[in-house]
Amino acid sequence: MTPIRCLLACLLLLAAAPPVAARTLEVGPGKPYAQPSQAAAAAGDGDRVMIAPGEYFDCAVWPQNNLTIEGASEEGTVITDKACQGKALFVISGPNVTVRNLTLTRARVPDGNGAGIRAEGKTLVVDHVRFINNQDGILSTDEPQGSITVRDSQFTRNGACEKACAHGIYAGHIGLLRVERTAFSETRRAHDIKSRALRTEVVGCTFVDGPDGTASYAIELPNGGSLLAKNNTFEKGPKAENHTAVIMIGSEGITQPTREIVVEDNTARADGDYNTVLVYNQTATEAVVQGNRLSGPITPLHGDGSAS
C-alpha cells in the first residue's frame, strides 16, 4: 500500500470510530479525585463532575466543552477561599458549561474582583448555586455571541468597591444575560446586577437590601442594551449606597443598540428616608413601565417612555 493510501485508510478508520463516551468523575473523600481541581485537570469534553458534600479549600480552571459540574447539594457542597489565576474559585473558559448545586464563597483577589465564577466561555448555565461573601458573584469577560443564564440561585453579601467595584453579577459585552427566580440580598456598595449584555432579562427575582444592605442599583445597564424586568420584587433599604434609582440605564454612555425597555408587573418598595425612581432611563428608547406596584417615596420613571 502506498503512503497516501495508508494515510487515507487511517483517516477513514478514525472517522468511523465511535465517539469517546462521556464519563462521570467523582470528587470527595474516598473518591477518585479528592479536590475539584484534580477532576478539572482530568476531565474531557462532555464529562460530568460530581462533587460530594464537604468544604473544599480549592479552586479550579475548567476549559472543557459541554461540561456539567454538579454538587451533591446546594448547601452542603462548598468551594471556598482560593482563587485560580488570580480570578475566581471557578474559572470557566470552555463553552456550554453547566454549574449546579454548589456554594461558592469567600473569593478574594488583590485587584478587588475575586469571583465565585469567572465566565470566559461562550455559554454558561448556573442552576441552584449560592454565591456568598465574594467580591463578585459572577464576573464575565466579553463574548459578543455568548450567553449566561442564572436560575434558582442566591447571591448574598457579595460586592465591593475597594478598587474597581465588584457586583453580584457583572456581565461584560455578551449577547444575553438571563436571570430567573434568583435572590439577591445585602449586596455591599455595588450593584446586584451590572450588565453590558446586548440583552438583559430579569424575571421572577428578589432584590432585598434589608436594614444593613448598602447596594447601589438593583440593575444597571451602563451602556444601554435591551431590558426585560418582569415579576420581580425590589426593596431599596435605608443604607443604600445610591438613592437615585432601582434600575439605571445608560449611566456610562449609550454604546450599543437598545431595542426595548420593558419593566412590568414588579413590586418595588423604598424603605429609606429619600426619594428614588424605579426606572432611570438615559437612552432615547421609550421605556414601557407598566403594572408595577410601588410603595414608599418612589416614582415609576425618569426619562423617555410611559408609565401606567
Residue ranges and their predicted role:
Residues 275-308:
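Leucine-rich solenoid repeat scaffolds
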Residues 81-90, 110-118, 133-142, 161-171, ...:
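Extracellular beta-strand/beta-solenoid scaffold signature
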Residues 16-17:
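N-terminal signal peptide c-region/cleavage motif recognized by signal peptidases
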Residues 24-52, 56-58:
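Acidic Gly/Asp/Thr-rich repetitive segments characteristic of extracellular carbohydrate-active
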Residues 53, 70-78, 95-106, 123-133, ...:
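Right-handed parallel beta-helix
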Residues 21, 41-45, 62-63, 92-93, ...:
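Flexible, charged surface loops at secondary-structure boundaries
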Residues 45, 56-70, 78-100, 105-123, ...:
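Extracellular beta-strand-rich solenoid/capping regions of secreted or surface-exposed proteins
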Residues 1-8:
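Bacterial N-terminal signal peptides that target proteins for export
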